[in-house]
Amino acid sequence: MTSLVVALCTTGASAQAAPQPLVADSGIAAAAVQLPPVPAVLDYQLGAAYTPPAGVTLVTRDSTATPAPGIYNICYVNGFQTQPEEHDLWLNQRKDLLVTGSNGKPIIDPEWPDEFILDTSTAAKRTRLAAIADEAITRCSQRGFKGLEIDNLDSYSRSKGKLTVDHNLAYAKLLQQRAHALGLAIGQKNSAEVSRRARNEVGFDFAFAEECFAYEECGDYSDVYGALVMDVEYTDNLPKGPFSTVCRSSDRPATTTLRDRQLVGPNNGAYRYDHC
């Protein structure tokens, strides 16, 4: 459970302190794109959609949900892997668009064993995949979301050599073009080490990270996107001490949030939420 034209200043946070409209540089006619607010108070609501806590100015929800009123909403799309509820659909109708191993069976994400890896290895397959992804991207736009979180850019690292970063960046460019045509900002998710290429070649507008502080990757994003980096840390993986330690660190993004791993709602006893 990993989704433009005027170039953003990537040398520091101050130049990106407020959202601004952009125009796309692709051949597709584009609507105005509004960037997420920075810094922001982020809530990450993929497991359940609920009224955001007081003070929240930015929320991410799944593409099947509706935006929270009155704040900036980012729409989650699993851009490079399949969703669990579509398991049979992909196996029965789209199997040729899945990466398969030497045994002919689709390769799965070992951490998310109900997700197949999409085959981005050829231009023809990327075009077909983008047409399928367009359903979710269009739904995000129609429901009023302002941004996209495209998950699993790093799927090539789980493809057993069948995919490369070049394949995924080329596919991401198709998603970026569609997002901007609909007026949606689009964020890089995963593959911190290729952030420079992702920004320059794809045209991602911001970065959405999970546990970049825990894995010491935040700088890879912020060096490219400045203040336009949002990070979610999790309660079960705080190797450097309590969340207050994260918040005191100059290495964290300005927009940093703590959540429980399953992202449950506040009516669940496992719910945890905090922010810097």
Where in the sequence are the language-model features?
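Glycan-processing catalytic domains of CAZymes
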Residues: 22-276
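Secretory targeting and sorting signals
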Residues: 1-20
